[in-house]
């Protein structure tokens, strides 16, 4: 089972991703976060197979959150999400 933490500051987007993945047998969104601070708090309490992380969120950006995740949980799998049409954030996120 792939257990996902979905992190995005738009509740409608989180709901859409949840709905999209609901038909997948081996995938579950088990937690949500509206900002980077909530992501870090969630990681302090449990582990996840995968984090879907928005690049631009309030509270702490996805890029800042990614740096923190890499420092404290270096083996954590993360997929960065962006609505930006440019790929300017790709090298930073890597």
Where do the protein language model's features map onto the residues?
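Alpha4 helix (beta4-alpha4-beta5 surface) of REC/receiver domains from two-component response regulators
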Residues: 64, 85-94
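Conserved hydrophobic packing residues within short motifs/helices of P-loop NTPase cores
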Residues: 5, 30, 79-81
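Active-site beta3 strand of CheY-like receiver
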Residues: 46-52
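The feature encodes the CheY-like receiver
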Residues: 13, 58, 82, 86
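Conserved acidic segment of CheY-like receiver
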Residues: 1-13, 17-21, 51
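Acidic catalytic/metal-coordinating carboxylates
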Residues: 35-38, 59-64
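Short amphipathic alpha-helix used as the core "switch/output" element in two-component signaling
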Residues: 41-42, 63-75
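Short hydrophobic/Thr-rich beta-strand motif most characteristic of the beta2 strand and flanking loop
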Residues: 26-34, 42
